């Protein structure tokens, strides 16, 4: 008895069993029936409109490289999706087309074939597309064929990003990558607000710790919301410890790898694109009208103490206002009495504050790129402009972004290649200084009985409209400058040495203003009002700040490939170092000579200045071993020895390993009779351990002494003295949070990857999270320091089908 007969006695007769063959084919035809019928209906209409055009009937047969009939192959007229057909059970098709039309024959995993329709019988042989079958996935410090990946990795190409009318990359990734969670931050809909990003949920609740993934742009940490989405070639998301462990303590909760476009050899190509976006507020709360609002208030008052908030006279005016029967001064919805506007329970307008504060806008984007080169040198230069506006109606809220990038790849000799990459990004964000999170919060707290304007047509002081339009600006300019250079040397065949140097400089400058604001009394005269609680009416202030971030990183690594028969080996090892520096300076002054020139020099009070300097550094040695046998049995081992300046002594260094394995079941000989139905089936599993050094405090082991300049409550020799307080207590035992996780799952593809999906079961343990220590007696005289004293565990079960997550269960403790 043969191996096939032992394992699958019924499947060996698959090709000979007509009934089963017809059932499978019928299922495929049912899957394709709707678009086919739609195309046929449309074609009939097209035929009526073109009776005078000469038609020919073209028939043919489509076979694969082995001479097997291909079922469900798409046959359509080029540039006319309404005229098409699909091949039947025997690979045959028939289509009526204009004479001389070009036919496109296509199928997933095969190269598209184009032929002329001349009314003759065609015999088409489809060739497998090696680029599709050998799809490459970007991983840490290299790439792998997708079929050989054993970690949890998802990839997004440029077509997905370009098809979405969004202004930044995080918006483009929403709903695209399973397990990638993007949520709106507390800053709400601010134009410069990126998304809060996590992979497979929150990974830590440790004090000062972050569970955000590491984001690398062409191998260097960067802000993905600032780069031009049009410049992106692909994005890889490394989800589990096996995939991300090569990056060590900077990536305990995954990695997002962004690769930008490169030039292609050939004639110079110029591409231009423009986008016009129409944006409108969505999912706004439906607020009560003033009549319902007043009735609820009165009912609450009666239930509480027997008193009503709105008098019967005001209730009558509320109803009349909504009916549009009020005339004269009452039509304004408010009255001036006893030296003030009678707002809230004394007003009778009917205002929907969400509709008043929001409106629809139009934004635009322009992109141009030039690329080309020879077989020795290729280049890519691109530029982009994006002008975006906020949805707030009052106060101009706008963000402008300029992108300029260039990339050169050069083959210097048979053994040496050079890559140089540069980017410049400028973002100008100009908005009302009052446009803070409190603004969004307060909209829902506004009473609908208050009108927008008083009886004289001036804005009332109960809403933020006056502050938004007249209270000053918050202007930020952010410049990012990336410089990257890479040298690749191949001293021997299949042995590569990589040297990468990266530098990123970010310059930020901001001016934040408080300008005098005024409402108007019953006679239309201006009256100074407080800009915000705690501010003196009529006061003014200007704050100017500047900060500069310098990031430097060095990557030195080497890899070696070796194939012995059906055994494939790849070994990689290297060194990584990072240095981050920040310098900041700010100044503030009040009581401007004139609000028309809001600068520090035009302030009249004592000038306040502040500044600082901080930095951190990381270093790590890493290695990886890959092995596969006939791309059937897969093994990967990673290790990284990491050091961080954020810890001290023997706590500074840590070793973090990971292991993963996979089995490509669909590459087994016994699977051949199933491969035209289930063409891909891979089982995989991984385990890994990573440290987390992403703490808020750069040096939590240092004692600090709070200081103050002339802030004492008494005088010495006629002056307020400088002060210094006792230092806090620190924990010398503070060390890494440790993230330990394992993942099992499988990937599958049906009908030559027409239908794809995956299943994952994932467990993550976060150990030694930083939290408060047990309280000590107050006689200690200081705050108890933070220590490593908390753990968290998460289970995730996820099922993905056709690129969509159809089931996700998350349990945390």
Predicted regions and their residues:
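A short glycine/small-residue-enriched secondary-structure motif
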Residues: 232, 383-385, 517-534, 775-776
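Short acidic-hydrophobic surface loop/beta-edge motif
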Residues: 368-372, 452, 562
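Extracellular/periplasmic, surface-exposed regions of secreted and cell-surface proteins
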Residues: 161, 211-212, 407-426, 460-514, ...
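A surface-exposed, glycine/aromatic-enriched loop/edge motif typical of exported proteins
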Residues: 285, 290-334, 418, 423-459, ...
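Short, intrinsically disordered/low-complexity patches at protein termini
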Residues: 94-95, 110, 118, 206, ...
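Short, small/polar-rich motifs associated with maturation and membrane association
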Residues: 1-404, 417-419, 482
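Generic structural signal for short, solvent-exposed loop/turn connectors between secondary structure elements
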Residues: 97-103, 115-124, 218-232, 428-468, ...
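Localized chelating/binding microdomains
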Residues: 163-165, 183, 196-198, 205, ...
């Amino acid at each position: 008895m043969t191996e096939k007969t032992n394992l699958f006695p019924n499947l060996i007769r698959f090709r000979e069993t007509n009934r089963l063959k017809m059932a499978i084919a019928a299922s495929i035809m049912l899957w394709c029936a709707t678009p086919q019928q739609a195309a046929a209906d449309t074609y009939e209409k097209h035929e009526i409109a073109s009776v005078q055009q000469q038609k020919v009937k073209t028939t043919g047969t489509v076979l694969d490289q082995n001479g097997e009939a291909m079922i469900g192959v798409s046959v359509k007229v080029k540039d006319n999706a309404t005229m098409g057909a699909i091949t039947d059970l025997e690979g045959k098709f028939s289509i009526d087309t204009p004479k001389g039309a070009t036919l496109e024959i296509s199928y997933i995993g095969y190269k598209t074939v184009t032929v002329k329709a001349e009314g003759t019988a065609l015999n088409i042989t489809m060739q497998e597309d090696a680029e599709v079958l050998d799809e490459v996935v970007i991983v840490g410090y290299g790439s792998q064929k997708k079929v050989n990946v054993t970690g949890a990795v998802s990839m997004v190409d440029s077509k997905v990003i370009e098809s979405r009318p969004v202004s930044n990359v995080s918006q483009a990734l929403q709903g695209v990558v399973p397990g990638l969670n993007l949520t709106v931050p507390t800053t709400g809909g601010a134009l410069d607000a990126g998304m809060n990003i996590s992979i497979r949920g929150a990974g830590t609740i440790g004090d000062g710790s972050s569970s955000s993934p590491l984001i690398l742009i062409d191998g260097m940490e960067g802000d993905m919301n600032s780069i031009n989405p049009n410049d992106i070639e692909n994005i890889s998301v490394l989800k589990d410890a096996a995939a991300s462990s090569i990056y060590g303590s900077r990536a305990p909760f995954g990695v997002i790898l962004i690769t930008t476009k490169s030039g292609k050899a050939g004639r110079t190509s110029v591409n231009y694109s423009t986008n016009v976006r129409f944006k409108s507020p969505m999912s706004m709360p439906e607020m009560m009208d003033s009549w319902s609002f007043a009735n609820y208030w009165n009912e609450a008052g009666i239930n509480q103490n027997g008193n009503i908030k709105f008098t019967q006279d005001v209730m009558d005016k509320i109803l009349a206002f909504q009916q549009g029967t009020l005339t004269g001064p009452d039509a304004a919805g408010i009255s001036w009495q006893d030296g003030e506007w009678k707002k809230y329970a004394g007003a009778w307008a009917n205002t929907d504050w969400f509709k008043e504060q929001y409106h629809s806008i139009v934004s635009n984007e322009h992109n141009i790129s030039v690329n080309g080169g020879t077989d020795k040198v290729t280049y890519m230069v691109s530029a982009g402009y994006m002008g975006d506006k906020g949805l707030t109606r009052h106060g101009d809220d706008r963000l402008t972004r300029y992108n300029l990038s260039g990339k050169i790849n050069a083959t210097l000799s048979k053994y040496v290649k050079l890559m140089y990459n540069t980017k410049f990004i400028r973002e100008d964000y100009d908005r009302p200084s009052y446009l803070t999170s409190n603004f969004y919060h307060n909209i829902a707290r506004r009473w609908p009985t208050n009108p927008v304007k008083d009886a004289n047509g001036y804005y009332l002081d109960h809403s933020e409209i006056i502050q938004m339009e007249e209270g000053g600006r918050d202007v930020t300019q952010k410049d990012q400058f990336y410089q990257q250079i890479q040298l690749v040397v191949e001293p021997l065949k299949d042995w590569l040495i990589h040297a990468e140097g990266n530098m990123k400089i970010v310059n930020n400058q901001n001016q934040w203003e408080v300008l005098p604001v005024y409402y108007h009394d019953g006679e239309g005269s201006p009256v100074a009002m407080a800009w915000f609680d705690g501010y003196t009416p009529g006061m003014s202030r200007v704050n100017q700040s500047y900060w500069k971030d310098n990031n430097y990183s060095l990557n030195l690594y080497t890899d070696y490939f070796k194939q012995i028969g059906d055994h494939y080996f790849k070994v990689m090892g290297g060194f990584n170092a990072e240095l981050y520096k920040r310098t900041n300076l700010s100044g503030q002054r009040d009581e401007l000579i004139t609000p028309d020139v809001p600068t520090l020099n035009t302030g009249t009070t004592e000038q306040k200045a502040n500044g600082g300097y901080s930095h951190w550094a990381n270093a790590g040695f890493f290695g990886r071993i890959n092995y596969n046998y006939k791309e059937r049995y897969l093994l990967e081992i990673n290790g990284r020895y990491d050091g961080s300046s954020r810890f001290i002594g023997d706590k500074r260094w840590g070793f973090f390993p990971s292991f993963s394995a996979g089995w490509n079941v669909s590459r087994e000989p016994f699977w051949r009779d199933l491969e035209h139905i289930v063409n891909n089936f891979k089982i995989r599993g991984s385990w890994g351990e990573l440290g987390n050094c992403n703490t808020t405090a750069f040096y939590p082991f240092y004692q600090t002494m709070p200081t103050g300049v002339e802030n004492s409550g008494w005088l010495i020799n006629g002056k307020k003295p400088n002060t210094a307080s006792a230092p806090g207590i620190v924990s010398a035992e503070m060390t890494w949070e440790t993230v330990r996780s394992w993942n099992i799952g499988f990937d599958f593809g049906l009908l030559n990857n027409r239908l794809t999906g995956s299943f994952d079961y994932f467990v993550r343990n976060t150990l030694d999270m930083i939290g408060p220590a047990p309280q000590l007696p107050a006689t200690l005289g200081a705050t108890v320091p933070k220590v490593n004293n908390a753990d968290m565990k998460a289970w995730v079960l996820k099922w993905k089908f056709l690129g969509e997550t159809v089931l996700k269960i998350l349990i945390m403790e």
